[in-house]
Amino acid sequence: MMNQDTLPNLYDLSLAEMERLMTAWGQPAYRARQIFRQLYVNLVDSPLAMTDLPLALRERLVAETRLAPLAPEQVHVADQGLTRKALFRLENGVLIESVLMIYPDRATVCVSTQAGCGMGCVFCATGTLGLLRNLSPGDIVAQVVWAAREMRRFAAERCISPSLAPPDDDSWWTPDTLEDQGSSEARSISVSRLSNIVFMGMGEPFANYDRWWRAVEILHDPRGLNMGARSMTVSTVGLIPGIRRLATETLPINLAISLHAPDDALRSALMPVNRRYPLAALLEATRDYLAATGRRVSFEYVLLQGKNDEPEHAAKLAALLHGEAGTTPLPLHLVHVNLIPWNPVPGMPLGRSERRRVLTFQRILRERGIACTVRVERGVSIAAACGQLAGARGLNVEC
């Protein structure tokens, strides 16, 4: 019997690679398109369910390939069922987490690109694990397939008719509010399928760039899940080579950069990566990215009580983005700041900014002409919010 670990994972294969496999097997190329459709449109979990294929081909797929859909070991639910965090155990035993967030007009899945993370940001639960391993393209794609299946079940339960395609727009930008939308949101749901992907789960995508980008191309393929490029967002701690590489890619993926501090001393204390890629170099790379793409960039800023949330921090951040601190000025019409009140992580001696401080910080930035919103929170009670994913039961916040 062949070792299952050495067999090709169907979720790892692009359509072109699947066509080459079929050709090598003496099959017509259109068989690959049938398989691709079964995987990403019909969302089957076994080659035997691909009933438009000859039985002999289905049996060969079972024998000579792997199809490893993710089945969660745990699913935690919050926000009246509109936020769902899944804990998955991968084939080699490591744990990762994904979060599905359902809104009235869209459904977004937050997926992991690594098991653990080696960036060591002091406010993030994932960083406490260290880097366990990079995820394969198939590991990343399988998380999205899980979310697509969840949305199919959700729509069926609510008798929502499927929409034809996900929005290819800027709907990932967060609403300008801190208010809990509550039960009215649950009643007004009309979305029926997965529409957005954010690569903001466990890990640093640009530290696993090649595998992450292969997953992006598979997810974008119009013959499969057909996720619009502008419906996908990648978040980085500021790995400059990745930012520069993304600027050259043909798919216009949205970019979010974790900033979290307005000066090098504070940012280095919060984010060790700043010692390698300090703010001046990061802003220069951001300016070059904006010039090359013309696409908006979001700066994410986690607010920590008494550490980076004072009015003087907001003023320094505004000066930084305006280029008044000896750094590269940015075209502010292409810049957005996303404020994120810190979400608690057990054992971390940090505090969450008060609402008053959050709104003051936002006001100062807006008065300087900087677009700024506060992220609407989801899943805090189940440790599914920003910075809380740890891929381990012991670090989860109990409901």
UniProtKB/Swiss-Prot annotation:
Q: Which cysteines are joined by disulfide bonds?
A: 110-386
PROSITE patterns the UniProt entry points to: RADICAL_SAM
The EC number on file is 2.1.1.192
Q: Which UniProt keywords apply?
A: 4Fe-4S, Cytoplasm, Disulfide bond, Iron, Iron-sulfur, Metal-binding, Methyltransferase, rRNA processing, S-adenosyl-L-methionine, Transferase, tRNA processing
Question: What remark does the entry make about the cofactor?
Answer: Binds 1 [4Fe-4S] cluster. The cluster is coordinated with 3 cysteines and an exchangeable S-adenosyl-L-methionine.
Active site positions: 97, 386
The listed locations are:
Cytoplasm
Q: State the protein's purpose.
A: Specifically methylates position 2 of adenine 2503 in 23S rRNA and position 2 of adenine 37 in tRNAs.
Q: Which family does it belong to?
A: Belongs to the radical SAM superfamily. RlmN family.
Q: What HAMAP family does the record tag this protein with?
A: RNA_methyltr_RlmN
Record's NCBIfam families?
Answer: PRK14461.1
* Protein name stated in the entry: Probable dual-specificity RNA methyltransferase RlmN
